[in-house]
Amino acid sequence: MFDREQEKAMSARNDEEELDNVNRRSVLLGTSSLVAAAALTSSALAQTQKAATPSAASSGGTTGSKPNILFIMGDDIGWYNVSAYNMGIMGYRTPNIDRIGREGAVFTDWYGQQSCTAGRAAFITGQTPVRTGLTKVGLPGAELGLGPLDPSVADVLKNHGYATGQFGKNHLGDRDEHLPTAHGFDEFFGNLYHLNAEEEPENPDYPKDPEFRKRFGPRGVIKSSADGKIENTGPLTTRRMETIDAEFLDGAKDFINRQHRANKPWFCYFNSTRMHIFTHLKAASQGKTGLGIYPDGMVEHDGMVGELLKLVDELGVANNTIVVYTTDNGAEVFTWPDGGTTPFKGEKATNWEGGFRVPCLIKWPGVIKPGTVVNDICAHEDFIPTFAAANGDTDLVERLKKGSTLNGKTFKVHLDGYNLLPFLKGDAKESSRKEFLYWSDDGDLMGLRVSQWKVAFMEQHTEVNPKTPLGVWQGNFTKLRAPMLYDLRADPFERGSTSMYYGDWVARRLFLIVPAQAIVAKYIESFKEFPPRAKAASFTINDVMEKISTGSPGKN
């Protein structure tokens, strides 16, 4: 059952009601796949290591001024592809990424999402992606993208006087209205999709009709600004892929230098295209490790992280700059050797920990003690409330529920993130986040974690074979009549279900079911006032048939 502190945390997160006020008997088994499948409780957990009280505490840095924010996001990089996590077992090192954790914190239980678009949407909006509809990987020509009713992290920071720039992959929509510069960023220079979509026009059998390319093909690498200017700098060809991250790096460094000269606090969001398939390396990066294309690409990627850290040092602003390194989703394993590595079960696009658990390292001078290891649950949705709190805005989540103005625009939304600042500073013993919900790219609730307990009520075991050559991307999820239960402390890699004693172990823990239903019901309750902005996209004919039956127009 739930201890009182966890009940209070859950209640404060969702609404003003106490968890005990939920009429558990009114939560009927079988009335909703979201509720009926949930079987979990928040048993108290003593974390092994906490973020310690810093030597020079302040609301957001050592100087008391607004902290700069350097946010670096990799692409499809596995938990074990960063040497701070693998301790060298992969045969190569990532010293610059590791440095962020050494001078700050390494997080073991940080959650992205199950795919590129979803993971980036969770960070940018502070909402679980099912609310925005951005759960499915965005494709060229698709209608769905980041909408005008959802505030972005850039909107939040613009409200506090920041200069905002994004460089590299976006993947939150194909159209002009989806570009970062329509959502709070002063400038953007980057690509809009995953790499394998960018190179499709180079296939010899790609349609030659220019109208097809115009309607369904990838746009080029875009340079845009908040004043409405949009420039297509040309296609992202396989040759350009060899050096495109260097282009983005130059743009990011130029942005930081300009804002430093202007004496403005800055938020730089750098999105590497490494290590999404298909990897194309310049000659100088090939063979660096002797271990293959992925390790070589990681070493190149780590070097670019090092260049950004070096610039921050040279400008003398390291003590007032938050540095974050993370990635969007779990490793894509089935494309190995051009694919990532994770010790967790599953991979990108699955319901398992391997699909959602991501590396995350944060350096925050004056807030996070160097060398910290954090085992508490945290997620990409938590960045917006935390960055707001770093600027003295501690009630953003509640204010946006009632309606609030950010960057000259009025929003009324339900943020799903938590303010982690009190925990990171050492003022709170535990992370505010006690739970995480696992949504599929189709918008189904696949599982729930509270404290160390996890339930999986959908599962996927698809391997690459002649019937499903694209592995997990083609295989269906199986809905379970009775959920599977895991203790992610005793069994973090979800292998307990292979034990001959697993059935007995689960049978002794059926007391967890009803409290879990209460949590899910309370979460779903928020959708009454804050319904999803859009339905998740589909790769199948179902979406087309639904549009035909409802008379929904297609893309013009």
Feature-to-residue mapping (PLM):
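Formylglycine-dependent sulfatase
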Residues: 2, 11-479, 483, 492-556
